[in-house]
From Swiss-Prot:
GO terms for molecular function: calcium channel regulator activity; toxin activity. InterPro entries: Spider_toxin_CSTX_knottin, Spider_toxin_CSTX_Knottin_CS. Its main location: secreted. The toxin is composed of 2 domains: a highly rigid N-terminal inhibitor cystine knot (knottin) domain and a rather flexible C-terminal linear cationic cytotoxin domain that forms amphiphilic alpha-helices. The presence of a 'disulfide through disulfide knot' structurally defines this protein as a knottin. It comes from the Eukaryota. This is U4-lycotoxin-Ls1a. It is found in: Secreted. Enhances the high-affinity desensitization of human P2RX3 purinoceptors. Disulfide bonds join C48-C63, C55-C72, C62-C88, C74-C86. Residues 23-44 form a propeptide. Keywords: Calcium channel impairing toxin, Disulfide bond, Ion channel impairing toxin, Knottin, Secreted, Signal, Toxin. Residues 45-88 are annotated as: Knottin domain. It comes from Lycosa singoriensis. Residues 1-22 form the signal peptide.
């Protein structure tokens, strides 16, 4: 009986060792495949429109500020013809929140 228990423990040890070898081999192949796919990946991000620049061509292209994304505001200037002018601007509420966060960072550390 002791011999049977000894052989079963030995068999289970060898089986678990061989299965982990196979799993490690499979994982390394999967990692190599993923790395080769990532190497072929192209950067798809388009250039953002800086603050206070014209965003009439794409109203969702404004750059991010420190915490929030700027918003494209459109308006009609006074005294000119009825052409719409759009520019990326930071909303006042976002500006105040960023100031509070900056003050909190300096106080905390």
């Amino acid at each position: 009986m002791k011999v049977l228990v000894l052989f079963s423990v030995l068999f289970l040890t060898l089986f678990s060792y061989s299965s982990t070898e196979a799993i490690d081999e499979f994982d390394s192949d999967a990692e190599d495949d993923m790395l080769s796919l990532m190497a072929n990946e192209q950067v798809r991000a388009k250039a953002c429109t800086p603050r206070l620049h014209d965003c009439s061509h794409d109203r969702h292209s404004c750059c991010r500020g420190e915490l929030f994304k700027d918003v494209c505001y459109c308006f009609y200037p006074e005294g000119e013809d009825k052409t719409e002018v759009c520019s990326c601007q930071q909303p006042k509420s976002h500006k105040y929140i960023e100031k509070v966060v900056d003050k909190a960072k300096t106080v905390v550390g």
